[in-house]
Amino acid sequence: MDHIFSPIHPPLERLRMVCEKIVEEQREAYEEHGRVLGCPVHSLGAEVSTWEEALQTKIKEAIAQHHRYFESALRDAESQGLIPPIPDPATRARIASAYCEGLMMHARILNDLSVLDAMAEGVQMIARMGPVSS
């Protein structure tokens, strides 16, 4: 992930690349196991993190790192004028990450990789959303 989120790549390209990497990993797992496996971190977390504190801590760290990667790309995209101003980049990063995780969970439940086809486009749409007025 460090390579994908390196500042040598344009920020919106980083978001596209991570989505492509996720889809690629899911396709490889499907070819090997005959099933969509979804995100190993979230799958494991959903199963055992409520009763295994040490594991829960590790899972939280992994999720937080993923959010920081997304947030750095969003902040860079905003500072370069590639996306509208974001009042709360950390929240936007969590939304984008949750979108990816939701797609992976749906793909796993349905055992259908095509669910992931919209991931990169959806993350780009989330990145480009303007502020929500109240």
Stretches with model-predicted labels:
Residues 13, 17, 36, 53-79, ...:
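Amphipathic alpha-helical packing segments from all-alpha helical-bundle domains
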Residues 25-29, 50-51, 96-113, 126-133:
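Amphipathic C-terminal alpha-helical segment
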Residues 37-43, 87-106, 122-125:
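Hydrophobic alpha-helical segments that form the core
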